[in-house]
A protein has these predicted regions:
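Conserved anion/nucleotide-ligand pocket segment
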Residues: 118-200
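Short, acidic/small-residue loops that bind anionic groups at enzyme active sites
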Residues: 86-125
Length: 264
C-alpha cells in the first residue's frame, strides 16, 4: 500500500479539507498520515518556519513515504526553501511531491535536482471535486501508477485523458490540441522536460539559486515551460512575463504553455 504524507509547508488550511482529503485518499486505497504541524495556524502560515521545515524534512527522510501531498499553497515556501534537506538515497526512491501555487518553489528545487514532481490538486480540491472530474481522475491514476514517481507519457485534449508509465528518465510527449476560439493557439507537437508552475512564484525566485534560468541550465535540451496564475491584474502578468523575457528565458524554451484567470 502506497503511503501519502500530508503536510502544510505554506499557508494555514481549514482542518476539514485535510480530513476530507484523507478520507478520499484512503478510499482510493492509500495509507495516509498527516504531518505534525499540518493543522496549525500562525498568522498567514500553518506553523513557524522552523516547524514547517521539520515537517518537510521528516517527510523527505521517511523511507516509508511514497508521496508528499501539500495541503494548500498560499505563501511561505520561499522563506524556507534553502533549509530543506533532500533525501540521502537514490533519486528513484524519493517521494513524489504534489501541489501547485506556492508549492512551485518546491517543484523548482526538485527540478534543479532532476526529480519529477506533480503540479496537481491539493486537499480542498481533493475534498470537493466530483468523482468524474477529469483532473481528479488523472491525478488518481497518476498516484496509483505502480511506477510512480517515474515520468509519465500521456496524451491530452486540453487535460490529461489517458497515459501510461514511461521508462525512467524517458522524455514525456504531451499533445495540446488547437482551440479554435483562441486565434493565437497553434497545433503542434513538442518533446522535452516540463518545468514551471505558478508565474508569481517563478517571478519571485528570479535572481535566486532556484530560478528558471538555473533550472534551464540543468536541462540537456530546451524544456517546455508551463505557467499558471489566478487573480492577478493584467499589468502584473505583463510585468512578470516581461521579466522572464528580459532574463532570456523565452529564448531557451520550446514552447510556453499557460493557464490564467486574470482580474481587471
Amino acid at each position: 500500500m502506497r503511503h501519502i504524507r500530508i503536510i502544510s509547508p505554506s499557508s494555514a488550511i481549514d482542518a476539514q479539507w485535510i480530513n476530507r482529503a484523507k478520507v478520499r485518499l484512503e478510499q482510493w486505497g492509500f495509507d495516509v498520515s498527516v504531518g505534525e504541524h499540518a493543522y496549525g495556524n500562525i498568522g498567514r502560515f500553518s506553523a513557524t518556519d522552523e516547524e514547517r521545515i521539520i515537517d518537510l524534512n521528516n517527510a523527505f527522510a521517511d523511507p516509508m513515504v511514497d508521496i508528499i501531498l501539500c495541503s494548500r499553497g498560499g505563501y511561505g515556501l520561499q522563506r524556507i526553501i534553502d533549509k530543506i534537506v533532500l533525501p540521502q538515497r537514490p533519486k528513484s526512491q524519493w517521494p513524489l511531491v504534489v501541489g501547485f501555487s506556492d508549492i512551485t518553489a518546491l517543484h523548482s528545487l526538485l527540478s534543479l535536482n532532476g526529480i519529477p514532481s506533480l503540479h496537481a490538486n491539493m486537499c480542498k480540491d481533493l475534498s470537493l471535486l466530483p468523482d468524474d472530474d477529469i483532473t481528479l481522475i488523472a491525478e488518481k491514476e497518476f498516484l496509483m501508477s505502480a511506477d510512480c514517481p517515474t515520468p509519465l507519457s500521456f496524451t491530452s485534449h486540453l487535460l490529461p485523458l489517458s497515459y501510461h508509465p514511461a521508462p525512467h528518465n524517458a522524455r514525456t510527449p504531451y499533445t495540446i490540441h488547437h482551440m479554435s476560439h483562441f486565434p493565437l493557439n497553434r497545433n503542434g507537437e513538442v518533446l522535452g522536460k516540463l518545468i514551471g508552475g505558478n508565474l508569481s512564484v517563478l517571478y519571485g525566485l528570479q535572481g535566486t539559486p532556484f530560478s528558471l534560468n538555473k533550472i534551464i541550465e540543468q536541462c540537456s535540451e530546451p524544456p517546455i515551460l508551463f505557467i499558471e496564475d489566478i487573480s492577478e491584474n493584467h499589468y502584473h502578468i505583463d510585468r512578470m512575463l516581461h521579466n522572464l523575457r528580459l532574463s532570456g528565458i523565452f529564448d531557451k524554451i520550446r514552447i510556453p504553455f499557460s493557464s490564467m484567470y486574470i482580474t481587471d
